[in-house]
Amino acid sequence: MNDMTLYLIIALVPLAGSLIAGLFGNKIGRAGAHTVTILGVAVSAVLSAYVLWGFLNGSRAKFDENVYTWLTMGGLDFSVGFLVDTMTAMMMVVVTGVSLMVHIYTIGYMHDEKVGYQRFFSYISLFTFSMLMLIMSNNFIQLFFGWEAVGLVSYLLIGFYFKRPSATFANLKAFLINRVGDFGFLLGIGLVLAYFGGSLRYQDVFAYLPNVQNATIQLFPGVEWSLITVTCLLLFVGAMGKSAQFPLHVWLPDSMEGPTPISALIHAATMVTAGLFMVSRMSPIYEMSSTALSVIMVIGAITALFMGFLGVIQNDIKRVVAYSTLSQLGYMTVALGASAYSVAMFHVMTHAFFKALLFLAAGSAIIGMHHDQDMRHMGNLKKYMPITWLTMLIGNLSLIGTPFFSGFYSKDSIIEAAKYSTLPGSGFAYFAVLASVFVTAFYAFRQYFMVFHGEEKWRSLPEHHSDGHGEEHHGLGKNDNPHESPLVVTLPLILLAVPSVIIGYIAIEPMLYGDFFKDVIFVNADAHPTMHIMKEEFHGALAMVSHSLHSPVLYLAIAGVLSAWLLYVKLPHLPAKIAQAFRPVYVLFENKYYLDALYFNVFAKGTRALGTFFWKVGDTAIIDNGIVNGSARLVGAVAAQVRKVQTGFIYTYAAAMVFGVLVLLGMTFWGLFR
């Protein structure tokens, strides 16, 4: 099998499974739908692992070829092609591996769904195909296709329960917010096409960069900026939408309206990593603009810290994990801004495993609670759901950066990158990611203690209480006990727990300090020496653990865990008093910094008001009633006046004739004697 065939199979097999499940779902049934989609993703996962292994043992070389030319227009070729290198191979394994776990898990989680079972499997398999096309692309056109495809499928999946108003609102919100980011992304691609050599293929664009190194572009009359800086910022606007960076992050928490498996897939391995992958892939461009990198770093720092604060007050078990995703995406963005692209991609990988684990473990707890998602109704689930308890503990330990867990190696590396960066804004970024360590540990173990320890709070609730999640989410009765989830749910948890512990230790040296990303990621070491300094400081994974004993990071994490234990295990009455004492801050967090209100009341309502103005004033009053109907009325009015002259009496016509003759005579004499 040649390389082209291999890569086509990896990309297209999930699409084939999606089409079969979607078009023939009623004929093949539920078992047929999940079998064909799982088989397709499993084939892709195995072949992706084979490709990655080839890169690791040196038997596989970088592949960059076009599959076919889609369109030729004005000397410009729009092609479909694959660029498969070490970064692509790593992402292929992450995407297909996590997707496979999600597919298997979905069999148990969606077991009781009466309708839409086949449709859901079709969607998640299509989601996998879309992400593969994005990461395997060798040109901006295919990148944009995958970019829009993951956006479309996420819209369908977030709104899977389309009869719920909250779900339809959430998927429309995600779609519209991402359109804002995509508009900037499209403008950036337009600049690349117009000024970077007239090609959209990555290798051609990168080769042309020296020709535009000092080029400027006029933004406004008398205002010129660096062409590369403007291009980088516009491309990053797209990343802000897809990877949910402040202030385009507001769609991500509401994506929890979709079923839990798709929450795991969106947050761990697909849509939210697209923007981070794109910036890393475009490292040769970004390395030419320190201004753009500073902006990226500051935005990532704001996202990491301030989204973490919002996770502290959440009571929905899935929303806690959602806000942790926002915060962790901020960490990765800080790494990008510090020119530590390899560190960002390393955290993308480790985060994918432990975040998928956390979401799926949360879903398992939700199953045990009869689909009640409110943590205030849980407690002591450790007694009833030991596998879910242990795997969520592992996920949280990795999330907060506990030594020897995967998240420790990647998260601490990001903090070190911010520390060593010399760009403007790096001081704020270092403070933000450092403070986020405490915040992350606090909300992660607040969730853990509320769910798995303490009193069994559902026993004090009314029977079949309403928790605001719809009729099917009725919760446990007073005398009911939670139950451990079936093997089809717990097996993916166990399998994801393994890389959540060991993958960081295995991968840190080759990915960050070896040559894994050689010739894939470009860093201008003279202008941005962060990685060069970190390489000198790194003496091995175990030495990194030893170094953490002298770092504030470990002690901030411990302080966060102890604070959560004190407030939610030893003194559970205290959080309510603290919230009351700091009521203004709590209300600010509860309203998510009022950004949703700003967007809804100013931008959404403002746009509708502007549209209403143009409709009523511009279209109806000026065009319809003014120009169109007004001209008709004018003709009618003139005709009505002229009609009065047509009386039918001879003396009227004679008087008109005499008047006309007098006018003509007057004009004649005026001309003669003037």
From Swiss-Prot:
Its EC number is 7.1.1.-. The chain crosses the membrane at residues 4-24, 36-56, 67-87, 90-110, 115-135, 140-160, 180-200, 219-239, 259-279, 293-313, 348-368, 385-405, 425-445, 488-508, 549-569, 653-673. Signal peptide: none annotated. One of its GO terms (molecular function) is NADH dehydrogenase (ubiquinone) activity. It catalyses: a quinone + NADH + 5 H(+)(in) = a quinol + NAD(+) + 4 H(+)(out). GO terms for biological process: ATP synthesis coupled electron transport; electron transport coupled proton transport. It is a multi-pass membrane protein. One of its GO terms (cellular component) is plasma membrane. Keywords: Cell membrane, Membrane, NAD, Quinone, Translocase, Transmembrane, Transmembrane helix, Ubiquinone. Pfam families: Proton_antipo_M, Proton_antipo_N. It comes from the Bacteria. It is found in: Cell membrane. NDH-1 shuttles electrons from NADH, via FMN and iron-sulfur (Fe-S) centers, to quinones in the respiratory chain. The immediate electron acceptor for the enzyme in this species is believed to be ubiquinone. Couples the redox reaction to proton translocation (for every two electrons transferred, four hydrogen ions are translocated across the cytoplasmic membrane), and thus conserves the redox energy in a proton gradient. PANTHER family: NADH-UBIQUINONE OXIDOREDUCTASE CHAIN 5. Belongs to the complex I subunit 5 family. This is NADH-quinone oxidoreductase subunit L. The gene is nuoL.
